[in-house]
Amino acid sequence: MGVSILTVYAFSSDNWRRPVSEVDTLMKLFHDYVRREGQRLAENDVRLSIIGRRDRLSLGLVRDVERIEAKTAGGCRLHLRVAIDYSSRHAILEAAKAAFLGLPEAKNSRGGPLDPSPGAPLAPDVDLLIRTGGEKRLSDFLLWESAYAELWFSDTMWPEFAAAELSNAIADFRRRDRRFGRVSNAA
């Protein structure tokens, strides 16, 4: 399919406002996934990176995430980035604060003054943002990186979103005229 980096939004910083039992279940599911799938990710040459805050995650989850990140660091078939306790607003504010204070983490590899994902592996700008579940909003997800992203909306809920629908989204994306602020190529 030509996808080298895939970022999925597993848990927004705003999701902490959900009922405690739901948050606990989501964190347990994520922790179980990291423990269960870490070896398979490594075997399939998939690099796993977690973006978002770690200070509010359980110590056990953070340890397991760091272990799997280290184990998969050399993966080059796919870079799977999972956003957990993630907020674009928070990331952008922290980057602005670091830039204002002159901190070294304020620099990014694109040559600009701000890195909206300090502490996270820098990824290229988003090409295609797929929103599942029938929602028509970005929900504070990769706002900086999605400045010129093509948007594709699906009524399918994430757990049921299958390869065929992903293929349709990518095929639609490939037919689009990406201008990045310029006049259409057809003009």
Give the residues covered by each predicted segment:
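Flexible, compositionally biased loop and terminal segments
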Residues: 1-187
